[in-house]
Amino acid sequence: MTRSSPAQLSRFLSEIQNKPKKSLSQNFLVDQNIVKKIVATSEVIPQDWVLEIGPGFGALTEELIAAGAQVIAIEKDPMFAPSLEELPIRLEIIDACKYPLDQLQEYKTLGKGRVVANLPYHITTPLLTKLFLEAPDFWKTVTVMVQDEVARRIVAQPGGRDYGSLTIFLQFFADIHYAFKVSASCFYPKPQVQSAVIHMKVKETLPLSDEEIPVFFTLTRTAFQQRRKVLANTLKGLYPKEQVEQALKELGLLLNVRPEVLSLNDYLALFHKMQAG
């Protein structure tokens, strides 16, 4: 019987006299077909090293091991430690947001790794931000289950209401594919939201230097703080309005353009103009 079995999970929770913690977004996968589909989507092959965040009871962990992966699992809740320690993995009982990713440096001798996870929904954005800002050159792919609403924001295109600074941030680092939707019935307990799996292929090279990247994201975050306003006005706290308007003109963009209209490449071109003065 697999760890994605509802009966197995129920037995485990009964044995430890505990229940899922809503505060930690503990909604466990209890559908083996979905577990297998996530691992297939992740492109994991034997000898890959994989970072799994929030393994819980280990349904996804078990399938990753079966696929031949070396798994490093980061779990905040110590109640799962005894069960996870039965598996041939490296286990870290710590808040993933506080885990120093440079501790995984030793695995880079094996090549780039992968991230595969059913992410705790309340910390999805901080975790994804951490993965790419702290260790962008560690990963080949990132395959994660997230809230469907967040998934649609991540893969959004310019001009839509879902398009925003998170979209630009993640699309800067990776080519992203909305893989499939996951019903609430595939979890225990059932979440109040729909879920989806996204697959990110991390870019080999980035268009900005390490020093430029945080400055660029300051620009994009500032732009979307008032997304319905004219871009030249939203950026006036960073640059003179006249300078922004001149840059927009040189790029062939309207002076009254709003933040959600510009593509990632448009923002990169604007950034270079602003940096050049």
From Swiss-Prot:
<keyword id="KW-0694">RNA-binding</keyword>
<keyword id="KW-0949">S-adenosyl-L-methionine</keyword>
<dbReference type="InterPro" id="IPR011530">
    <property type="entry name" value="rRNA_adenine_dimethylase"/>
</dbReference>
<dbReference type="InterPro" id="IPR023165">
    <property type="entry name" value="rRNA_Ade_diMease-like_C"/>
</dbReference>
<dbReference type="GO" id="GO:0003723">
    <property type="term" value="F:RNA binding"/>
</dbReference>
<feature type="binding site">
    <location>
        <position position="27"/>
    </location>
    <ligand>
        <name>S-adenosyl-L-methionine</name>
    </ligand>
</feature>
<keyword id="KW-0698">rRNA processing</keyword>
<feature type="binding site">
    <location>
        <position position="29"/>
    </location>
    <ligand>
        <name>S-adenosyl-L-methionine</name>
    </ligand>
</feature>
<dbReference type="InterPro" id="IPR001737">
    <property type="entry name" value="KsgA/Erm"/>
</dbReference>
<feature type="binding site">
    <location>
        <position position="95"/>
    </location>
    <ligand>
        <name>S-adenosyl-L-methionine</name>
    </ligand>
</feature>
<dbReference type="GO" id="GO:0052908">
    <property type="term" value="F:16S rRNA (adenine(1518)-N(6)/adenine(1519)-N(6))-dimethyltransferase activity"/>
</dbReference>
<comment type="function">
    <text>Specifically dimethylates two adjacent adenosines (A1518 and A1519) in the loop of a conserved hairpin near the 3'-end of 16S rRNA in the 30S particle. May play a critical role in biogenesis of 30S subunits.</text>
</comment>
<feature type="binding site">
    <location>
        <position position="54"/>
    </location>
    <ligand>
        <name>S-adenosyl-L-methionine</name>
    </ligand>
</feature>
<feature type="binding site">
    <location>
        <position position="75"/>
    </location>
    <ligand>
        <name>S-adenosyl-L-methionine</name>
    </ligand>
</feature>
<keyword id="KW-0963">Cytoplasm</keyword>
<feature type="binding site">
    <location>
        <position position="118"/>
    </location>
    <ligand>
        <name>S-adenosyl-L-methionine</name>
    </ligand>
</feature>
<dbReference type="GO" id="GO:0005829">
    <property type="term" value="C:cytosol"/>
</dbReference>
<dbReference type="InterPro" id="IPR020596">
    <property type="entry name" value="rRNA_Ade_Mease_Trfase_CS"/>
</dbReference>
<dbReference type="InterPro" id="IPR029063">
    <property type="entry name" value="SAM-dependent_MTases_sf"/>
</dbReference>
<keyword id="KW-0489">Methyltransferase</keyword>
<dbReference type="Pfam" id="PF00398">
    <property type="entry name" value="RrnaAD"/>
</dbReference>
<keyword id="KW-0808">Transferase</keyword>
<dbReference type="InterPro" id="IPR020598">
    <property type="entry name" value="rRNA_Ade_methylase_Trfase_N"/>
</dbReference>
<protein>
    <recommendedName>
        <fullName>Ribosomal RNA small subunit methyltransferase A</fullName>
        <ecNumber>2.1.1.182</ecNumber>
    </recommendedName>
</protein>
<comment type="similarity">
    <text>Belongs to the class I-like SAM-binding methyltransferase superfamily. rRNA adenine N(6)-methyltransferase family. RsmA subfamily.</text>
</comment>
